[in-house]
């Protein structure tokens, strides 16, 4: 059996860290949505008991360091699976960008393996299992738009956001998520209005969504990396209705209602930034094919 499945990127419409927990993680409130920038995974069931990864990108490990490998190994051990799998990963999501590319790949792998290994697990069971690998993976298992709480693994579904344009720009730098959280001072930052964001999404109010965007991690990343702030400022100068860093960065995204204005923002970032994308909110159409 072979299956092909997409792994869409995510953006944080709002990201709040409330306090640091005893386990070392921060208690978070994040409103996230998937977008139509996506990796593609092709999975083939093997009779031989082995996990084979083939990543069509440089600098990405194909062994136990890869979240996809960890996801496959976890399912094999949990359910005593004696079959193997070959997974080909066609990368389109920028790496180390704050867009959950690795987490989305792992989520797609869990869903694909559930099918080709005939495990019969529910989406809720897959999400629960995923929390053993990483905090963002549970959201990626569900996809769409949702509120993530706890350390990010508790998911409450929300309606999809209204149609709009999203321009992404990633500078040629990398940031360390653990370092950003370590330097975050939750008592000294402006916190986003998560409640207002959720209310705006529920009634389909794009202006309310734009006005409610916020990310407490900007207080650290923008201070350490001025080029990230310059991208955000440039997006607003070219007509973005909202601009925000996704996750711990360094990718910044702009939200725009009209295509013509989005194109202007996109063109204004090309040449200024190495990786620029113009996308839409994710649609579930053509998510997976089975042969």
Swiss-Prot record:
<dbReference type="InterPro" id="IPR004424">
    <property type="entry name" value="IspE"/>
</dbReference>
<comment type="similarity">
    <text>Belongs to the GHMP kinase family. IspE subfamily.</text>
</comment>
<dbReference type="InterPro" id="IPR006204">
    <property type="entry name" value="GHMP_kinase_N_dom"/>
</dbReference>
<dbReference type="InterPro" id="IPR014721">
    <property type="entry name" value="Ribsml_uS5_D2-typ_fold_subgr"/>
</dbReference>
<dbReference type="InterPro" id="IPR036554">
    <property type="entry name" value="GHMP_kinase_C_sf"/>
</dbReference>
<dbReference type="GO" id="GO:0050515">
    <property type="term" value="F:4-(cytidine 5'-diphospho)-2-C-methyl-D-erythritol kinase activity"/>
</dbReference>
<feature type="active site">
    <location>
        <position position="136"/>
    </location>
</feature>
<dbReference type="GO" id="GO:0019288">
    <property type="term" value="P:isopentenyl diphosphate biosynthetic process, methylerythritol 4-phosphate pathway"/>
</dbReference>
<dbReference type="GO" id="GO:0005524">
    <property type="term" value="F:ATP binding"/>
</dbReference>
<keyword id="KW-0547">Nucleotide-binding</keyword>
<keyword id="KW-0808">Transferase</keyword>
<comment type="function">
    <text>Catalyzes the phosphorylation of the position 2 hydroxy group of 4-diphosphocytidyl-2C-methyl-D-erythritol.</text>
</comment>
<keyword id="KW-0414">Isoprene biosynthesis</keyword>
<protein>
    <recommendedName>
        <fullName>4-diphosphocytidyl-2-C-methyl-D-erythritol kinase</fullName>
        <ecNumber>2.7.1.148</ecNumber>
    </recommendedName>
</protein>
<keyword id="KW-0418">Kinase</keyword>
<dbReference type="Pfam" id="PF00288">
    <property type="entry name" value="GHMP_kinases_N"/>
</dbReference>
<dbReference type="InterPro" id="IPR013750">
    <property type="entry name" value="GHMP_kinase_C_dom"/>
</dbReference>
<feature type="binding site">
    <location>
        <begin position="94"/>
        <end position="104"/>
    </location>
    <ligand>
        <name>ATP</name>
    </ligand>
</feature>
<dbReference type="GO" id="GO:0016114">
    <property type="term" value="P:terpenoid biosynthetic process"/>
</dbReference>
<comment type="pathway">
    <text>Isoprenoid biosynthesis; isopentenyl diphosphate biosynthesis via DXP pathway; isopentenyl diphosphate from 1-deoxy-D-xylulose 5-phosphate: step 3/6.</text>
</comment>
<feature type="active site">
    <location>
        <position position="10"/>
    </location>
</feature>
<keyword id="KW-0067">ATP-binding</keyword>
<dbReference type="InterPro" id="IPR020568">
    <property type="entry name" value="Ribosomal_Su5_D2-typ_SF"/>
</dbReference>
<dbReference type="Pfam" id="PF08544">
    <property type="entry name" value="GHMP_kinases_C"/>
</dbReference>
């Amino acid at each position: 059996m072979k299956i092909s499945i997409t792994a869409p990127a995510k953006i944080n419409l709002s990201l709040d860290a409330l306090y640091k927990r005893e386990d070392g993680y921060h208690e978070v409130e994040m409103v996230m949505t998937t977008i139509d920038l996506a990796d593609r995974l092709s999975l083939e069931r093997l009779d031989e008991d082995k996990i084979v990864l083939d990543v069509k990108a440089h600098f990405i490990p194909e062994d136990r360091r890869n979240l996809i490998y960890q996801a496959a190994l976890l399912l094999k051990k949990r359910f005593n699976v004696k079959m193997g799998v070959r997974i080909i990963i066609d990368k389109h999501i920028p790496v180390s960008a704050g867009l959950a590319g690795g987490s989305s790949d792992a989520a797609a792998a869990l869903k694909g393996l559930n099918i080709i290994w005939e495990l019969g697990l529910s989406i809720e069971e897959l999400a629960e299992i995923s929390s053993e690998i990483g905090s963002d993976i549970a959201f990626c298992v569900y996809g769409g738009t949702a509120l993530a709480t706890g350390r990010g693994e508790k998911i409450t579904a929300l309606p999809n956001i209204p149609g709009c344009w999203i321009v992404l720009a990633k500078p040629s730098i990398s940031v360390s998520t653990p370092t950003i959280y370590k330097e975050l001072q939750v008592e000294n930052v402006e916190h986003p209005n998560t409640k207002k964001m959720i209310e705006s999404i529920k009634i389909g109010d794009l202006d309310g969504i734009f006005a409610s965007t916020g990310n407490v991690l900007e207080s650290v990343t923008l201070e350490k990396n001025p080029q990230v702030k310059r991208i955000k400022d440039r997006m607003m100068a070219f007509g973005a209705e909202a601009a925000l860093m996704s996750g711990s960065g360094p990718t910044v995204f702009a939200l725009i209602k009209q295509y013509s204005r989005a194109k202007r923002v996109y063109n204004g970032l090309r040449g200024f930034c190495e990786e620029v994308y113009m996308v839409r909110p994710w649609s579930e159409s053509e998510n997976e094919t089975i042969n």
